[in-house]
């Protein structure tokens, strides 16, 4: 399988059924819980999440940490989403992960963001990441990034009124 074929398969994955973290949690369990291997700074909000992750990434780099960063969406190449102190996730790692995921039998097939999140956490474990900055995707309690098990800090950027209903209804509920 080529990198381009792996990406085509990933992009074709659509979430089916009810939103929630159960699919990504099942996926992470099959991978031996890579999310347990690093501390995370979970970045949530409507705007500015990518900037906060970039600032954190720069701070981690300056401190000489073995770090990871997970953001979305990417601008040019999927590998921009998943980075460590050693660079972006290699094409070969993406192909290897997709080949594995395609062969697995799933009760509820994981969607694109579930798969991308699991790949990021797996890659962080493989690269010996100690601390990762992780940007939430769709946000709210059903976001795949909520499968993180060792959150050291949560950063909440601004929350737009257009997202309040989906995230809890009020700013107070979102903050909880």
Task: Give the positions of each predicted feature.
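ATP-dependent carboxylate-amine ligase catalytic core
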Residues: 17, 21, 25-36, 61-149, ...
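Short N-terminal amphipathic alpha-helix/helix-capping patch enriched in small hydrophobics
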Residues: 6, 20-24, 39, 52
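Short Gly/charged-rich anion-binding patches and loops
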Residues: 5, 55, 119
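Short beta-strand-centered segments that line the small-molecule binding cleft or hinge
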Residues: 153
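Non-catalytic interaction surface on structured domains
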Residues: 7-11, 30-39, 56
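Charged, amphipathic alpha-helical linker segments immediately N-terminal to NTP-binding catalytic cores
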Residues: 1-17
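A conserved segment at the C-terminal end of the G1
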Residues: 39-42, 51-68
